Amino acid sequence: MNAPAKFSTSQIRSDFLAFFEGKGHTIVPSAPLVPGNDPTLLFTNSGMVQFKDVFLGAEKRSYVRAADVQRCLRAGGKHNDLDSVGYTARHHTFFEMLGNWSFGDYFKKDAIAWAWELLTQVWKLPADRLLVTVYHTDEEAFALWRDVIGIPESRIVRIGDNKGAPYASDNFWQMADTGPCGPCTEIFFDHGDHIAGGPPGSPDEDGDRFIEIWNLVFMQFDRQPDGTLVPLPAPCVDTGMGLERLAAILQHVHTNYEIDLFQTLIGKAGSLTGVADLENKSLRVIADHIRACSFLIVDGVLPSNEGRGYVLRRIIRRALRHGWMLGVRQPFFSKMVPTLVELMGEAYPELVVAKDTVARALSAEEERFAETLDAGMKIFDEVASRSQDIIPGADAFRLYDTYGFPVDLTADIARERGMRVDMEGFEFAMERQRETARAAGKFGGGVALPADLVASMSPTVFLGYEAYDADALKVVAILRQGRPVERAEAGDEVIVFTDRTPFYAESGGQVGDSGQLSGPGVSVEVADTQKFAGQFHGHVGRISEGALALGDVLAGEIDTQRRGKTILNHSATHLLHAALREVLGTHVQQKGSLVAPDRLRFDFSHFQPITADELAVIERKVNAEVRTNHGVEVHNMAMQEALDFGAMALFGEKYGENVRVLKMGGYSTELCGGTHVTRTGDIGLFKITSEGGVSSGVRRIEAVTGQGALDYVADEERRLLEAANLLGGNTTEVVDKVRALTERQKRLERELESLKAKLASGATADLGARAIDVAGVKVVAVRLEGFDAKALRDAMDRLKQQLGDSVIVLAGASGGKVALVAGVNGSPTGKVKAGELLGHIASQIGGKGGGRPDLAQGGGEDGPALATALDGVPLWVKQHLG
């Protein structure tokens, strides 16, 4: 029998897409690893994720046949293969899924025939090495395989309900407990009887001989709440085939790590780590993880301590720890990126575009973890040496909290040593920390609308895009002290709901409007407007006169000056977001914002501080767009239409079917429900006031606009002029004069240190003569005026060299405070401990201190007690020497 031809991973991708394009399929790009249409899903973990709404009938596409190569991730959440990666033949964090789809078009006959054609005619797989499974009641699929394809019945396996319930089977697919579902047929490759394992459905099915390569799902039923299956009017096909395991078969190897793509990555990892054994499991881990980490960063995820960012951090740190195991102590992981780009850049052009961003983000994380990895491993070794088979949860939490060790990394290390982590104890420690954080962060609780009130109201109609005031606003609900009332009186603090309103309710980072509601004999001062249950505008304020009742008709007028300042800042936020992505890279994603009348605050993903030069460029770009005076266009459209229009959606946000798109020239196009200027020139001036870190991987910029920016610049000029006057020059000389002052200060500090050293040297010579002999040990306990802790330590070092076996206590007094240093040198070290001695002295002068057996330091209050404490040192030493 002739061996099948070999195919490269790249060729397999292109063959698959070309084959189905020839069958009338639209080739669809891979969706990002971060699902845009499913907030319940951490990552895209299968090919069907981007088509989920199509199958559910919530979305229409312009095609009925599609094919794609989808990048997928399984690490975190329900689908998590992280612990197995590197140790098994076919587990990966990142993998590619080949898929073809029919949305009410072709069905079983074509799907099966085309799968067989591609496998046996294009890729030349021997038909006698292929075996298929069908759901036990799917007679149609069974007959197609037997009668049309010609597979003997002996190689068609019926799989029943093998998961303990009706339709709970490896060969019956369902999206949820109800909804689209149907049988599937799977194609397996037989590696031969030299490998252990039996066919699917047999007791030995978990062996490695028969490997599933393609799953064809036939969605033909709608499962009802009572469990019955109703035929769908337009059945669909959803197929999935793992690229890596298919490549292993087409390249005549048994494990995925032996295919061309992985062999190149493993070779690069070996070169960077100095490991020649390419079978090393740590090299496999590194090769796998570079794909997952790189594509997560491409898709906008950066390392952080929560959500998707924390999953990325866990994967990176697992790879770094495996590098550490191989003896690597220098950055190496980010150096894998160019090789990955060479291998996968043609298939994924977005990787090529983001390669520098990926490398910088990985490098920054390497540097961050390197600071704690060695120390953390020492702590782990200490814990492991005093534990039996279990790493206590409290210690695992300390490794996580102090040294940045994700708990699954600690579990990984423990497993390698035949141990396990007390996960219950770890979760207890985590929850205790969460409770502490919650307690520290508690403030006045929010108000929730009663369910019956929500059911009785219609969503508030917002008029504020076009109008700053409005009449005929009907009061539909009043809350007083958080409870619905029919009437409220003057002086009452209330939340008023009307059927319509010009007041913007706080959302999307923009603060709510303030202003006034008024009617015959009643006035409400509105301090804020909040959104309740996502659709009702609540006017938060106080009744200043009269009484308010349900059904009253009011007029509303917002504070136009406050709104006017706010819209400048909101529109500037959009320009800032675009400028950040242009200057820093497309990895920048909004992580939070505040748009207030007096300032804007914008939080975004970025892995390092922004330089002064970068900030200057960002500010210039925003102001250039302001001066261009773009018209600001507003478009209302369907979500998919908005994305096709180029609108940027925020990761993690859930949008409705129809969205509002804000476009500023060709520079910024975003989904936004806020209020904005009509032209960018209205912003006037944009000025950044600060930049800093919020958390790991998240930066913050604060800025002002319009008159606020002019006032800020005027204040800066005033301060600069004041500084120039203090320095005795003009504003152009400030930098030079400050530089000269700084250099002079440094010179004086060096001279001062030199004088202190000479003083300490002279004092040391005198102190040696004052030493008292206690049982053959020289004891010195003295007060030194004006000595700081450093000068005391220098004097201590000289005295130890001069005296040999000795116990020394030095007290530096200055400004009513005392710095203490205690040292033990030579023979008394075992009996006299510096930390205990210093603690004994400090306790007598209202202070504290401690340290090592040979050196300790502390402090306290100056006064008569210090002399008494120092005088008692020789006796204390004598008692401890025995």
UniProtKB/Swiss-Prot annotation:
As its record notes, the protein acts as a catalyst of: tRNA(Ala) + L-alanine + ATP = L-alanyl-tRNA(Ala) + AMP + diphosphate
Q: Which cofactor does it need?
A: Zn(2+)
Name of protein: Alanine--tRNA ligase
Keyword Oxidoreductase carried by entry: no
Give the UniProt record's GO annotations in the biological process aspect.
alanyl-tRNA aminoacylation; negative regulation of DNA-templated transcription
Ordered alphabetically, the record's keywords are: Aminoacyl-tRNA synthetase, ATP-binding, Cytoplasm, Ligase, Metal-binding, Nucleotide-binding, Protein biosynthesis, RNA-binding, tRNA-binding, Zinc
Organism for this UniProt entry: Xanthomonas axonopodis pv. citri (strain 306)
Q: What is the lineage of its organism?
A: Bacteria, Pseudomonadati, Pseudomonadota, Gammaproteobacteria, Lysobacterales
Gene name, Swiss-Prot/TrEMBL? alaS
Give start-end ranges for the coiled-coil region(s).
none
